Amino acid sequence: MLAKRIIPCLDVRDGQVVKGVQFRNHEIIGDIVPLAKRYAEEGADELVFYDITASSDGRVVDKSWVARVAEVIDIPFCVAGGIKSAEDAARILEFGADKVSINSPALANPQLITDLADKFGVQCIVVGIDSYYDKDTGKYQVYQFTGDEERTKATKWETRDWVQEVQKRGAGEIVLNMMNQDGVRSGYDIEQLNMVREVCKVPLIASGGAGAMEHFAEAYQKANVDGALAASVFHKQVINIGELKQYLKQQGIEVRL
């Protein structure tokens, strides 16, 4: 059985790590490189970096820090933010990232998923999906430009349909960002994860809502996700990654120690 992954997520804005609640009101957490190094040393399996305003600003991830991160960590990392072409992706991979993740650009141009998968292989193409539960309609809707409060908007896609579409086009992994839970620390949306898991045949990463160690265990045991991503609980040292892995092991969950 493949080990379940623990993935700290670092939202980057203007060269610093920031964190919001439900994608709003971001506060500065600190510098990118020391934080990345700390997580690698604590036992993270992988890191994900989101340049959260790159897509809405119409630019690509600022590359200077990607190379600096690659120099100090020896675990895989994924970079997202405004990647609109194979050239953009190639540059980030050349700087040392192991994977690239696309979100809003994939919604604008779904063919991009196929182009990147064909050129670099599906194993390094991740699609991020920002999913919002609309209480009025009872539906999970895909949103885009979520890094910019003024431009965030619903798309025509329902989450389940978009999950199927991106797989058809070559996504090698899916990160499901559950917007209602983001930064609230009340647990992952297990119901939504199960709905997506039914149609998701590639690795599925849960994102949004982790507040306690048992939330990670729930996501693995009740929704069979391949990895769980979290930010605020790690940034604010509410949960130590090494201790989390020991806890998960005690729950009978396969993790890399």
Curated annotation (Swiss-Prot):
- Which keywords does this chain's UniProt record carry? Amino-acid biosynthesis, Cytoplasm, Histidine biosynthesis, Lyase
Active-site residues from the entry: 11, 130
Q: Which GO terms describe its molecular function?
A: imidazoleglycerol-phosphate synthase activity; lyase activity
Q: Does the keyword rRNA-binding apply?
A: no
Q: Name the coiled-coil region(s).
A: none
**Pathway involvement of the protein, from the record:** Amino-acid biosynthesis; L-histidine biosynthesis; L-histidine from 5-phospho-alpha-D-ribose 1-diphosphate: step 5/9
Task: Give a Gene Ontology cellular component term annotated to this protein.
Answer: cytoplasm
**What role does it play?**
IGPS catalyzes the conversion of PRFAR and glutamine to IGP, AICAR and glutamate. The HisF subunit catalyzes the cyclization activity that produces IGP and AICAR from PRFAR using the ammonia provided by the HisH subunit.
Q: How does it assemble?
A: Heterodimer of HisH and HisF.
Question: By what name is this protein known?
Answer: Imidazole glycerol phosphate synthase subunit HisF
The gene it comes from is hisF
